[in-house]
């Protein structure tokens, strides 16, 4: 078993907490950090603290932003009557890369998962219903991961929003359990085009 000095071991341990980072990658990152000049480390630390302090959630759609409303919600050229519901900001970014969607978003912050003790009350679903009920919305597009949790969440939201507007779900050319952030732009564009009606 490899033994590290305590400060290095602690640094590696912090990197291992990052999603998708295993022990080897954590070690590589820690060793890379140690090779950098102190000025670079100070700039990096400052950037981390600034992002953590100044980036919050859009009061309208819950996307990440440093303003009250995110850039997408403020954009008057976007179709404000077309809302795409995603689980996380990373899914929003994946759809934006596809350059197909011209509406706005609502980030619910996860998926309903009883096994993980995540119920609807822990997600931004109530705020979505309020947003739709108070506005003239032509269509809600559900772009949630094709999984048991994604299906459960889509059906739940679909039932809540059915009295207010048309609800559709994007078509998928990918296997169950796939993460939207890893899907290529062409597949995502086709998924948006081929969406199906839920209500």
UniProtKB/Swiss-Prot annotation:
Similarity section: Belongs to the RecR family.
Gene that specifies this protein: recR
Mapped zinc finger ranges (C4-type): 58-73
Domain Toprim: 81-175
NCBIfam families referenced in this protein's UniProt entry, alphabetically: recR (TIGR00615)
GO BP annotation list: DNA recombination; DNA repair
Disulfide bond entries: none
Keyword DNA damage listed: yes
Protein name: Recombination protein RecR
InterPro entries assigned: DNA_Rcmb_RecR, Rcmb_RecR, Rcmb_RecR_Znf, TOPRIM_dom, TOPRIM_RecR
UniProt keyword list: DNA damage, DNA recombination, DNA repair, Metal-binding, Zinc, Zinc-finger
Pfam families for this protein: RecR_C, RecR_HhH, RecR_ZnF, Toprim_4
Species of origin: Prochlorococcus marinus (strain MIT 9301)
Gene3D superfamilies membership: 3.30.60.80, 3.40.1360.10, 6.10.250.240, RecR Domain 1
Matches recorded under HAMAP family: RecR (MF_00017)
